[in-house]
């Protein structure tokens, strides 16, 4: 594997944050400097965490996932007051979801290792599985290439329930068939059988979406020391009850903090991402198997426009009795993470970084400082045949990332013809229409009754010219079919659906192509934190 860095244009908060713009950096409590990380360690030492209870839960949970010895030792290390975490999170996508989930985990592992060495304290990697998520449409699919098209392949569970990812039971046979259909779209390789077995081993041990995700990730990173946590695990929810109570008692201050910080963001010229009602409580409650967002209504906590209503005392009582019924929204999830873990750094994608910039005053309302927010590592893989296609078309590796591939294709095609087809036909139509306009005027003067027919005649002539143009373009494309197919392959591989590769393709394709140790080989690489995009030639 050969790794290169390229500068890819970014926009908005992420671009300004990485470029060191002071205005946006002031929306975060720590710069990404070594001194700032040292200060973060000192700040965390002044706080108390329920470490032993957390260790007990994480040992049980990660052991159930058949964690490696390095993970078990890292969990135990969390009981020490001088141990901290680097953390990231994601929904429990089937087959682990898009590649960026894997890249987030690699980011967590690398930063934890780097900071442990530079700060001289124990730093462990943690990945937070968003088990409370009820939106199955976000996690129940993957993309494949089929019949020279990119196809979204959805897993249709025959017994769907309106439950969280932690509670939604998987129909194992249905899921197994879905996985087999996906692998049929991959080339048969020496690794296919082993990868299918690898996936099926995880599936057989799983009852829910989160189980399947957790087992797959743990098997993939079994020797890395990665700690997994299911954010909606009933035992974890019990530990979170005191903080849920705190949120309920301070929800007005939380909403005010969010509003004030969003005003700051607006003044800096950015558009806020988080949308909430002014009476939001920022907590979900599970009612009749549905995740209901609570709102304030004249001192009562209501859901679904008043369909459900609770007094403060009733809500607190229910939290103590059934904590697993409660979960956080986009505003309070980072707060809960901060409450549970001694977080040295949070790693997020571009969208997460943008919405965290809106939370600074929310953190302060609770008495927290926002942890250092580190943009995750971004990666694109270039297979050998794609590298050959780029070379044959005289394209640089950076070109598909800096330009629209369709535009590159059009430019290349135009260069194969002495005079651009579009320009020549525009000129021809203009000349012909000028002549025809004069001709119509002549016809109208002699016989006004033929005016309508003359107009139709103009339309027909235009239609025939456009048909000729289309036929010419089609024949030119057929003549250069080999080269144009190379552009299509480049687009599918590097910019599928016009998006970054890591937002569309799944890691199983690469495991099938390069073996079960593919992720291990990627982890051996050293990635920089300078905001540049990493291109790995395979």
UniProtKB/Swiss-Prot annotation:
Reading the lineage from the top rank, the first entry is Bacteria
Record bears the keyword Ligase: yes
Top EC category: ligase
- Residue pairs linked by disulfide bridges in the UniProt entry: none
Q: Name one GO molecular function term.
A: ligase activity
Q: What is its EC number?
A: 6.-.-.-
The residues forming a coiled coil are 460-484
Provide the alphabetized UniProt keywords: Coiled coil, Ligase
- What InterPro entries has UniProt attached to this entry? Bacillithiol_biosynth_BshC, CC_BshC, Rossmann-like_BshC
Which NCBIfam families does the UniProt record give? thiol_BshC
What family classification does the UniProt entry report for this protein?
Belongs to the BshC family.
Task performed by this protein: Involved in bacillithiol (BSH) biosynthesis. May catalyze the last step of the pathway, the addition of cysteine to glucosamine malate (GlcN-Mal) to generate BSH.
Protein name per UniProt: Putative cysteine ligase BshC
Source organism of this protein record: Bacillus thuringiensis (strain Al Hakam)
